[in-house]
């Protein structure tokens, strides 16, 4: 069989279609799924696509997760989901001056950071997420203190 040559937009649309219909837990599974459709991709390409599409990993039980599109419509939806994620997956929040570090369960930092970004708060300059750590830059030291209190409250529910 001949592999299909897709544009980036076509490939990303195909990824969205797959994760909307199927439970895909890892980048490797997504690579295999695309290859089953004769779409040749590398895991590095899939990693970039996941970031650009702002996919999040949602828990599906028994320690497993699946990729999903973050489909928050309103500010309240984002706040509710952020609270749920903080209660379930955030382990620690620490602060130094106007910077905060949020430690999460493996694989959940990106989803939490995405929701923080979607709030578009004036007191948050920006976020940077890895696998289990989020770096949050607050506008001022005072705002960082306030954010830390707010994040601790979210952790407690």
Curated annotation (Swiss-Prot):
Superkingdom to which the source organism belongs: Bacteria
Pathway(s) of this molecule: Amino-acid biosynthesis; L-arginine biosynthesis [regulation]
Primary localisation category: cytoplasm
GO molecular function: arginine binding; DNA binding; DNA-binding transcription factor activity
Entry keywords, A to Z: Amino-acid biosynthesis, Arginine biosynthesis, Cytoplasm, DNA-binding, Repressor, Transcription, Transcription regulation
Cellular compartments per GO CC: cytoplasm
GO terms, biological process: L-arginine biosynthetic process; protein complex oligomerization; regulation of arginine biosynthetic process
Subcellular location: Cytoplasm
SUPFAM superfamilies: C-terminal domain of arginine repressor, Winged helix' DNA-binding domain
Keyword match Transmembrane: no
Function: Regulates arginine biosynthesis genes.
Family membership: Belongs to the ArgR family.
Protein name in the entry: Arginine repressor
